[in-house]
Structures are given as structure tokens and as C-alpha cells.
Regions:
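Glycine-rich, proline-tolerant flexible connector loops at the mouths of alpha/beta enzymes
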Residues: 2-34, 127-137
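Glycine- and other small-residue-rich loops at beta-strand/loop junctions that grip anionic moieties
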Residues: 9-13, 17, 35-39, 60-62, ...
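Catalytic alpha/beta core domains of metabolic enzymes, predominantly
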Residues: 78-225
Length: 227
């Protein structure tokens, strides 16, 4: 197991979030070489965190709202960072893939206008709990497929959102991750301590051709057997 990137968020009420986030990032970087996802809804905190970060950061996140893009994209450009963007705007969260794609188109245009390379854009196609909407996962998978076909962008998603409020969440999360990878998902925010989810990711990578000749799969199997 193990994470490939760490998300750092210091959104604690009634605190100096910019100062806290900057200190947290420096502390985390003193402990690990893993890349960091700088997570805040406060623009000043993002600026403070990016200013002390050593390396190429990933910002989590911005929406398709005009004022959010106008505030955050200059920071993305200034610090040569990457950005996670969500296809929702002032009207709320679109429920269908075509509605989400309208906002994805808007985000792509804004990113290009800001001079940020599209390879630095990561779209969150929005995963909602299937416990509240039986069509939720189908809409998310269709959004992933359309983003892949139209733009070929990197994508990340909350891997456990689909199972919220339901029993046996690990089984649902593992199945969803496998389906999403097949549709074109390239990364996910997930619990790297859950063996079934990690195994679903590794197996999916092998089965869709991301793990040539099963090198990673075989290596991990041997490591587990010899542990």
C-alpha cells in the first residue's frame, strides 16, 4: 500500500490558516519526499503554502465559478503548479454528464487563457453517493469517459464518496475504482490502508494495460508472499 501523494489541509475555524498551512507544508516536507497536494478554499492560504513548497505542487481545488478561477489561476501560473478543478459553478452541482461537460469546457478555456498547460489541469468528475441517487455512479462514469475522449485530461476523484451512508463500503469503493479506471480515471483520493481498494487499483492497472507484462503486479505479489 502507501500513498503516492499527501493532501495537506489546515482549514481549522478561527485560526490563521495561511500561517498554519505554510508551517504544515514545511513540516511535512521535512519528513517525506512525497509530493504534496495543497488543499484550501482560502486563496491567501494557497498563496502562503505555495510560497514555501519545494517542488511542483498540486492545488486542491477550484470550481468553474468565474470568481474562483480568476482568483486561483494566477497562482497556478505564478508557482507553476497543477490544479484540481471541479465541474460545478454558481448554479450548484450538475447531476448529468452533459451538464458537467459544459463546465469542463468552460474550465479548459479559462486554463488555456491563463497560460496554464492543460497537462497541469486535473478534473474531478464528481462522485456522489449512490445511496441518494441510483444514477450517481453511472453519471460519474459517463463524465469520466467524455473527459477522456474529448480532452485526454488527468482526473482525480473522491474514491469513497459513492458509498457514503451504505454498509460494506470497502466493497463498493473497490468496485467503483475499478470501473472508473476502466472509464479513464487516472488518480483518486482514497484510503491507501484498505487492502481491497489498493488491490482493485493494481489489478485494474494490469488489466487495462497500464502495468506492462504485469511487472508491478508480480513484484507486489512476491513482496507480500515473502513478508
Amino acid at each position: 500500500g502507501g500513498a503516492d501523494m499527501l493532501d495537506v489541509n489546515m482549514g481549522v475555524p478561527l485560526t490563521d490558516e495561511p500561517a498554519l498551512l505554510a508551517e504544515a507544508i514545511k513540516l511535512v516536507q521535512s519528513l517525506t519526499d512525497l509530493p504534496i497536494c495543497i488543499d484550501s478554499s482560502v486563496v491567501e492560504a494557497l498563496d502562503a503554502g505555495l510560497a514555501v513548497y519545494e517542488g511542483k505542487a498540486l492545488i486542491n481545488s477550484m470550481t468553474g465559478e468565474d470568481d474562483r478561477m480568476e482568483a486561483i489561476l494566477p497562482l497556478v501560473k505564478k508557482y507553476n503548479a497543477a490544479i484540481i478543478a471541479l465541474p460545478n459553478d454558481e448554479t450548484g452541482i450538475p447531476m448529468t454528464a452533459p451538464e458537467r461537460m459544459v463546465i469542463v469546457d468552460k474550465i479548459v478555456k479559462a486554463v488555456e487563457k491563463a497560460g496554464v498547460p492543460l497537462e497541469d489541469l486535473v478534473i474531478d468528475p464528481l462522485a456522489m453517493t449512490v445511496g441518494a441517487d441510483p444514477e450517481a455512479v453511472k453519471n460519474t462514469l459517463e463524465t469520466i469517459h467524455q473527459i477522456k475522449e474529448k480532452y485526454g485530461l488527468n482526473m482525480s476523484i473522491g474514491g469513497s464518496n459513492v458509498s457514503f451512508g451504505l454498509p460494506n463500503r470497502h466493497a463498493l469503493n473497490s468496485s467503483f475504482i475499478a470501473m472508473a479506471i476502466a472509464a479513464g480515471l487516472t488518480s483518486a483520493i482514497m484510503d491507501a490502508r484498505t487492502p481491497s481498494v489498493v488491490e482493485a487499483v493494481r489489478a485494474s492497472d494490469l488489466l487495462i494495460g497500464n502495468d506492462a507484462w504485469g511487472g508491478n503486479w508480480i513484484t507486489r505479489f512476491r513482496e507480500a508472499k515473502n513478508a
